């Protein structure tokens, strides 16, 4: 079983261009690019939301002072 040579790819590209035309291929490219961009945006938004909701630790020192109270 032989792999794809450069000629196979060239012939396939020519057939696709003849079938669909360059304008349809350009529109398909725009649609695919927009879908990829939207997917990346949604993944980025989910990562930001997850980082905002993640538990955080706060390091602090508590200072106590003694107070005297008088009960009457």
From Swiss-Prot:
GO terms for cellular component: TAT protein transport complex. PANTHER family: SEC-INDEPENDENT PROTEIN TRANSLOCASE PROTEIN TATA. It is a single-pass membrane protein. It holds the Pfam family TatA_B_E. GO terms for biological process: protein transport by the Tat complex. One of its GO terms (molecular function) is protein transmembrane transporter activity. The gene is tatA. Part of the twin-arginine translocation (Tat) system that transports large folded proteins containing a characteristic twin-arginine motif in their signal peptide across membranes. TatA could form the protein-conducting channel of the Tat system. This is Sec-independent protein translocase protein TatA. Residues 47-72 are annotated as: Disordered. The Tat system comprises two distinct complexes: a TatABC complex, containing multiple copies of TatA, TatB and TatC subunits, and a separate TatA complex, containing only TatA subunits. Substrates initially bind to the TatABC complex, which probably triggers association of the separate TatA complex to form the active translocon. Coiled coil: none annotated.
């Amino acid at each position: 079983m032989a792999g794809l040579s450069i000629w196979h790819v060239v012939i396939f590209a020519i057939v696709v261009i003849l079938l669909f035309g360059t304008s349809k291929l350009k529109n398909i490219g725009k649609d695919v690019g927009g879908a990829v961009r939207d997917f990346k945006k949604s993944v980025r938004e989910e990562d930001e939301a997850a980082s905002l909701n993640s538990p955080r630790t706060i390091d602090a020192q508590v200072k106590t002072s003694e107070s005297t109270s008088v009960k009457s």
